[in-house]
Amino acid sequence: MFKELYQYRELLKTSIKKEIRGKYKASALGVAWSFINPLLQVLVYAIVFPYILGNRVDNYIVYLVSGIIPWTFFQTTLNQSVSCIRNNYGIIKKVYFPRVILPISVVCSGLVNFMISCIIILLFSLIWGVGISWHIIFVPLIALIEGMFALGVGMALGAADAYFQDLEYFVMFLLQLLF
């Protein structure tokens, strides 16, 4: 598999670029959505939990951002990985290439988006005076591990999704429930 991926590395690079560019292509705000989406989620949770439900946690906003951004990365890449084989069925039927390129490109583009979103975590940590630990050097490694986990689960569920197309919606619901 790795030898074949190496042989098709240009296709993999092109597919990753297509995923990154295609995500915000028709959007007026473009890549800014990498910042806006998590900020809007944080805003909703920051209002609902501490003020309406009475949940009080020190540095709650930083706590919230530190959880929402990695979870959103996992949720998005897993959802897209589950359906990417079925969504590209027309191409798969016509041209041979390693099918694993499709979910790998989804996860890699998600990693790029996640690393951009990590800037929000840094900013919130500095603004709220939490500070930044030297442990931050492990974020890329942890993101890579999280991405590999999403890739593995996404590939397994993607194979099943080819036969049970409702699985995609069940996975979306389950991931929302788990958060």
State what each model feature region is.
Residues 1-179:
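Hydrophobic transmembrane alpha-helices and immediately adjacent juxtamembrane helices
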